[in-house]
Amino acid sequence: MQKITGETVRDDFNSINTVLHYTRAAHAIGLWKSERAIITRYLPDRSAEILEAGCGAGRVAVALRQLGYENVTGFDFSSELVEQARNLAEERGLADLIFHQADATRLGDCRPIADRSFDGVLFLFNGMMQIPGRENRRTALRELHRVCRPGGHLIFTTHDRDDPREAAAWAREAELWARGEQNPRLAEFGDRYFTDDNGNTFMHLPDRKEIFEDLAATGWVHVNDRMRDELASETPKVRNFSDNCRFWVARK
């Protein structure tokens, strides 16, 4: 059976149910309290050049512009979501907000991004973990490192496989992998692929050790990491939209 690939994930993100899910969130939820807290702490300059990877339907990029950040550029590899992001920006009177279709593992293919450098880079709502394959995720980290200015920050989120509430589930999953009985479409321990009302979703759930190793291997210096509920008490709407996650901050 064919493994989950980047093309699989792109097709899933272009599906109507997934596009509707992210578009509704962009219109109705906006910036989380935790996102605002960590972004304004590590990127306090409202004139900073900010690149948002995996911008989806524009939820974060549009909210940052409304918060006063003047130079935000977003990209996503889903053409359907990029179109929705542009529509949202236009509806909010931000037609000059720039969105590109681009692949985080191949930023050199998008000259408007590849030819620039940024003060900070964001990859929120666990977007980096929706890239199948650890080496591919490391490639994305290297690409983001390349377009980030020295001293600039990377802020991203992941799930946390070390969460004690998940221990029993991961113990069972480890037994399946030991017997070779895991989902044959998954390539690495920590991968999940599931279907719900919002469509198909691939997600890699790392432990902290994995992220520390990946940052070190790609030139980033770890600065901070905190669970979302340590940063802010989110609204019920946000908690219904997204599980708790770990925020990571790294510096070039």
Language-model region placement:
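Conserved class I S-adenosyl-L-methionine
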Residues: 1-45
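Class I SAM-dependent methyltransferase "Motif I" SAM/SAH-binding loop
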Residues: 54-56
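Class I SAM-dependent methyltransferase SAM/SAH-binding core
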Residues: 59-108
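A short acidic, Gly/Pro-enriched loop at the edge of an enzyme's catalytic core
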Residues: 110-120
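A short SAM/SAH-binding and catalytic strip from SAM-dependent methyltransferases
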Residues: 119-135
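A short glycine-rich, Lys/Arg-flanked "PGG" loop and its adjoining helix->strand segment in the class I
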Residues: 138-150
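SAM-dependent methyltransferase
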Residues: 155-215, 224-232
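Core SAM-dependent methyltransferase catalytic element
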Residues: 236-252
